Amino acid sequence: MANAPHGGVLKDLLVRDAPIAAQLRQEADTLPEIVLTERQLCDLELIINGGFSPLQGFMNQTDYNGCLDNMRLADGNLFPMPITLDVDEQQIEALKIQQGARIALRDPRDDNAIAIITVTDVYAVDKVREATAVFGSDDLAHPAITYLHKSVKNFYVGGDVQAVSKPAYYDYVALRYTPAELRQHFAKISWRKVVAFQTRNPMHRAHRELTVRAARQRQANVLIHPVVGMTKPGDVDHYTRVRVYQSLMPRYPNGMATLALLPLAMRMGGPREALWHAIIRKNFGVTHFIVGRDHAGPGKDSSGKDFYGPYDAQTLVTKYTEELGIEMVPFQQMTYIPSTDEYQPVDEVTPGTQTMDISGTELRRRLRTGAAIPDWFSYESVVKTLRESYPPKAKQGFTLFLTGLHNSGKDQIARALQVKLNEQGGRSVSLLLGETVRSELSSELGFSPDDRQKNIQRISFVAAELTRAGAAVIAAPIAPYEKSRATARDIITKTGGAGNFFLIHVATPLEYCEATDRKGNYAKARAGQIKGFTGVDDVYEEPTDADLVVDISRQSVAEITHSIILLLEAQSLI
């Protein structure tokens, strides 16, 4: 029998009566609307499907204060994580958000109305208080605290919601169970005791052994329940992770384990988050929940210390186990014993026994360099999946971003690089020359600071997409402003796959650029015929963070090209 929902009743708000659903959709089209953020969408989905039972909407101020102060809602139910809908003053005024107002909540991906909220109150946020109460700190090294201070708006809207529709998904649809559906699935396959395993990382042999041990100890089945909403910045993308989980499932004895995806926006809140995760799994019908070492920990604070103790999460969940009605299965870190070819919890290893481990950092290094990943650590199918998504350096894309004055030699260097990289082979090469981009992508833009910024953003977007696809990108705009170049670096390193970005300052002196200007553009600018010309009546802010500085007045194109090739070789990219 599945576990009872938290609070006694599963708050499944999905409307199954077609006429009522149609009426709500019709009403939503007439209401003021809030387009949700990614986190708000994740939260709303788990509100309307019952994953956050007993919540029936976003927290009002009374529930919010109770959650912060003693982890309890006004009705006395335990709930350790604030679930809030943040808005700013402009939205409050423009949408007339006040008690009794009805607001449509829309999916940012397709603009569909997901729910209608009936506002009970609007209240100001004390972000320092929230950070300290929930995360035990106000240190911006914590990703959720950074999000709170930099992304969350200054007011919260409380109120119950009515579901209009479910968020649409096109990936892994068969694995996306609501709490009611997963409970039905457990009943169908006659699972009475279920151990849930929460993860935001790929799984390897240690994780398989840990979950099998947990099932054996509790005479239960295993639910692999990974988070596929928002996780920690820098985590492996959920597409890759789900392929890993799918490849791992046949490694379990037939009928022991099943896989379901959880659209949760994690907060990396350590002990409170572990308690929250247990409540969510209870709502999904689970009877046991694995809490491991440093569960949902965010890593180090700004002083280099862990935000939470390694077993603080286990301690807090244990305190409330009886009230929750879900049994925690505590586990320490698993370690490999070469002599017996098995994994054991570190606290069960006999002193003096040789053990072996591979850290997350070391695994990433091996993936990056193509170094071997041993069978004792992971399975061949898992490693193959990870290598497909995270190829070694020699197969990764990169962007060479050349910046310098007009006629500084950027174009000659860029074209020579294109030839050398094509000669090298192994990846496609794309050339984004300043004049070409201006003609093909930015023909409507002028040369004002704002237009220059937009032009660089467009170049950066294209370069990032090409880099992510494994190409070698050579971009050669003037890019005179530090802000624009920082934007380019940020966009390409964050969205360009491995984020291999190199800023090359073509520092040819203005006098040389002007003296060798066969087109006479500098002369026209001096005569006032061209306005906003870099180096004449517009500034060029010299880079202070260039990866390489070259000068065509002192070096030949061949020498400069060779120095750039050596830079790439030093990074194992060629």
From Swiss-Prot:
Q: Tell me where on the tree of life, at the top rank, the source sits.
A: Eukaryota
Task: Give the CC-aspect GO terms.
Answer: cytoplasm
Q: Where is this site: Transition state stabilizer?
A: H204, H207
Q: Where is this region: N-terminal?
A: 1-170
Keywords of this protein's UniProt record, alphabetized? Allosteric enzyme, Amino-acid biosynthesis, ATP-binding, Cysteine biosynthesis, Cytoplasm, Methionine biosynthesis, Nucleotide-binding, Nucleotidyltransferase, Transferase
Residues at the catalytic site: T199, R200, N201
Per the record, which residues fall in region Catalytic? Answer: 171-395
Query: Which amino acids does the record list as binding sulfate?
Result: Q198, R200, A296
Residues where ATP binds: Q198, T199, R200, N201, G292, R293, D294, H295, M334
What free text does the record give on domains? The adenylyl-sulfate kinase (APS kinase) is non-functional. It is involved in allosteric regulation by PAPS. PAPS binding induces a large rotational rearrangement of domains lowering the substrate affinity of the enzyme.
Its annotated function is as follows: Catalyzes the first intracellular reaction of sulfate assimilation, forming adenosine-5'-phosphosulfate (APS) from inorganic sulfate and ATP. Plays an important role in sulfate activation as a component of the biosynthesis pathway of sulfur-containing amino acids.
Q: How does it assemble?
A: Homohexamer. Dimer of trimers.
Q: What is the name listed in the Swiss-Prot or TrEMBL entry for this protein?
A: Sulfate adenylyltransferase
| Originating species | Mycosarcoma maydis (Corn smut fungus)
